[in-house]
Amino acid sequence: MSESNSVSVQQMLDRSCWVCFATDEDDRTAEWVRPCRCRGSTKWVHQACLQRWVDEKQRGNSTARVACPQCNAEYLIVFPNLGPVVYVLDLADRLISKACPFAAAGIMVGSIYWTAVTYGAVTVMQVVGHKEGLDVMERADPLFLLIGLPTIPVVLILGKMIRWEDYVLRLWRKYSNKLQILNSIFPGIGCPVPRVPAEANPLADHVSATRILCGALVFPTIATIVGKLMFSTVNSNLQRTILGGIAFVAIKGAFKVYFKQQQYLRQAHRKILDSQEPEPEEV
């Protein structure tokens, strides 16, 4: 019995902190702790050293769990009992921290929704006319306005995502030899090409999302301007804007089809030249 006690006393005298590597002889007043199942040189550690190490691992989150880096045993960390006031404040702080992400998401969604409602109302007044648009919205059901107005930018964006020019271009390339008038409008559209170039994936374009968004939201303004320039004799604001939008989409689509066809032909007639460097002399 005395031998086992002497061995345990000797082990305690040989204690070494695995954080700072100090022993009992270096600091006899330090508080020691054995927080895990480790044996040997990693069994003991200073309370102050372990507290600093736990602070580094938790990084300000006092509820985070910390384990021993050697045996992976979780440290048993206890705190003094809180008073009722501090307990209520701590509970309120944790509840607020958990609720803030949901509140931020709700605020973001609400902001986007009311922005869409405002944009829809402005678009109605722009397309129909300021006075006529206000009269229409005043007579409409509020629930219909809250649902219908924010769908206006959504419909515009979805409509902008339809790449109808690509479908028209594929059909023209396929049936252009049967319609000779297309060759006069778009030169080279029906001519055979030496190779079929690889076309870029439209989803891989990082600018496409911003272009779709901006183009869709600006479209009512452009349709109104084009309608006033090309169809000034039409008295109805709505009809003039619709005609302006159709004309703009058709003209823009024709130019886009022509531009893509020329790019297609340019890639199809691409050649790789011989190297201009002199060949090495044979030894």
Swiss-Prot record:
Establish whether keyword Mitochondrion is in the entry: yes
Membrane topology type, per the record?
Multi-pass membrane protein
Protein name according to UniProt: E3 ubiquitin-protein ligase MARCHF5
One MF term from GO for this chain? zinc ion binding
Q: Where in the cell is it found?
A: Mitochondrion outer membrane; Endoplasmic reticulum membrane
According to its UniProt record, in which pathway does this protein act? Answer: Protein modification; protein ubiquitination
Its GO biological process terms? protein autoubiquitination; protein polyubiquitination; regulation of mitochondrial fission
Q: What is known of its domains?
A: The RING-CH-type zinc finger domain is required for E3 ligase activity.
Please give the Gene3D superfamilies that the UniProt record associates with this protein.
Answer: Zinc/RING finger domain, C3HC4 (zinc finger)
